[in-house]
Amino acid sequence: MTFLRPLAALVCCAALLALAGCIASTPPTTAEVGVLYSKGTGPMPMLLATDQVDGYIAWQPFVEVAPLAGIGKVIAYSGDLPPAGRWKNHPCCVLAIRTDLAAQNPGAVNAVTAATILATDYLQANPDESAEIVADWLAGKGDFTYGNITVSSVAVLQRAFPTVKFVNEPTEPWKNGQVEFVHALRDLNTLTGSLQNASDTEIRGILFDTQPYTAARAMIYAGRITTPPKVTRKLGIGYLMSDHDAALFVAVKKWQYFNDTYGVALRPQDPSKTRPDLVDLIVNGQKVAEIALVPGDAGPQLMQLAATDAVQFAYVGNPPTIAAIDKGTPVKIVMALNLEGSGLVAAEDSPAKDWPTFVQWAKDRSAAGKPLKIAAPGKGSIQDVMLRYALRDSGLSVKEV
């Protein structure tokens, strides 16, 4: 994804929204769209079904819930939102690791990183099976239920998977996106710590430690994972109940395959559990560490767990990770987990069927004095940013409701 450099000027002048996370006040235009912050994605299907909103922008798998439940239709996936090509391959979730663990137990950190990379490679090659694994983890392969809305978890995940790009390599364009995100958050006055006045070079040093990724990839290419010294304390991996964290779920559920094929595995202590909460890190047949798997409601909660050393690894979105690092949480971003994976949904009975017709619907409703109300997970979320930028590009203003 290509990010624009002059974010400060854009925000200060309120001429544009900065691409990698900036939320700016939108100047009045002829047509207006209301944005409602729903404090996460969980409430969105019910809000749409009960006509409290006209649509929502969310991460997967919530995008696919609406069409399968018959309450909405997908207007655009995040990579296709306007301006054309601007959001292609936009960054999303990352693997963040506490710096003290990486310094004290680099071998164990490299092994967990390798397990994640191998699981990502596996789910890229086996998307249908991986979708079922995620559905099993999230809902026991049963139904997702939101109030009186019930949909098959397997069907939802099978639709969602093709819209998420599961990747790990911390490329230079990907890093540049994170740096620009820091500039945007700085302009919002949300960064008050180490990132507030840092140069771009300093930002990179503060945010990233890609050595575990490099070491893990090297071991995978060499065909042997190095057995690290045993870790004497229990470790923790924080994660979100989202298909964006599919690599973790696949690594645990397919542990035998990874153990037999590559010599590294996250072996569940109780394989009968749909959602294991304890795993053993196994390298070349040896138990290296016991790891608790800790689900969180949102990224900030996971970063709080990391700050208190309750977890040492986090599968988490980049906005809360950057904010936590700025405040002094001792973590570094090691690699990507996925790109894209969000989408805009509109009510099933709406006249919108794609972005141009959505814009026309918004203009018609605004002219009639009944502006559309679209739910977003939270102010400053990447979904909020993409929606605001797309609306602005189409000549629509935003009002928080």
Predicted feature locations:
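A conserved helix-loop-strand patch within extracytoplasmic ligand-binding domains
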Residues: 24-53, 60-62, 67-103, 336-401
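Secondary-structure end/capping motifs
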Residues: 103-192
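Conserved C-terminal helix/tail region of periplasmic/extracytoplasmic solute-binding proteins
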Residues: 179-234
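Short helix-initiation/N-cap motifs at beta->coil->alpha
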Residues: 32-50, 59-62, 269-304, 317-319, ...
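C-terminal motif of bacterial Sec signal peptides marking the signal peptidase cleavage site
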Residues: 19-21
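Short, polar/charged alpha-helical segment
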Residues: 241-290, 295, 300-301, 307-308, ...
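Paired acidic/hydrophobic, glycine-rich loop segments that form the ligand-binding mouth/hinge
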Residues: 54-59, 73-75, 292-295, 311-317, ...
